[in-house]
Amino acid sequence: KSLIYTLYEEGRKKDPQVYDVKEPDDRQPGWRTRSYLAKYDLASGILQPLTFGYHNVYLNDISADSRYLLIGKSEERLTKRPTTLNSLYRLDLNDMSVEALVEKGEFLNSAQFSPDGKSILVTGSPEAFDGIGKNVEEGQIPSMVDTQLYLMNLADKKVRPMTKNFNPNVQSVDWSKADGNIYFTAEDKDCMHLFQLN
């Protein structure tokens, strides 16, 4: 048995004699600090780093059988919108192999495993996955804060928009292991509603 930790590594200190700004957000305190994942083995007491590098890495979900981690990585791209890109990876804790699910995805937010571990549910704007969730007139740009649901089959990586024709803005979502249904809250004007998706 083990625990998965999110840990933080402090970035290189700024030289007070040099005005060094990597990007605009570097002016914010703590911007150079990076997050990474580690596994703590309860039997041996050994803490094993799972990720490292320049970009922030975070845990999205753990599969129901505790074999896989759904890992996210964020990085900046300031030359065009969106300025933040998110990648998704599936890490097999049995052999430590990593499978890339999405590389430098645009307009993505979060992701979670299905109860059977064969799919992932991803949240993002209508422009995610090359705009398959867009439901506006040609030439119009959909709102970046209009959160949609997408279902990715892990066998073939095909993605299906689940809420393309659903008007309310998805807020929080959970895929129930009890009944296999997806439950989510969504914002409709000034009201918040709870929905079930099967």
Where are these regions (language model features)?
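A broadly tuned preference for mixed-charge, low-complexity surface segments
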Residues: K1, S44-L47, D95-K118, V159, ...
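Residue-level detector of Asp-centered blade-edge/turn motifs that repeat once per structural unit
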Residues: A64-D65, P115-D116, K177-A178
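Short loop/turn segments that connect beta-strands within beta-propeller blades
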Residues: D41-G45, D92-M96, N153-K157, L197-N198
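A flexible loop/linker signature enriched in serine peptidases of the S9 family
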Residues: T6-Y36, T51-V57, G72-L88, A100-N109, ...
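Hydrophobic, helix-prone linear segments
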Residues: L37-D41, L88-D92, F113
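Hydrophobic beta-strand positions that form the internal "hydrophobic ladder"
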Residues: L3, L69, G117-I120, I182-Y183
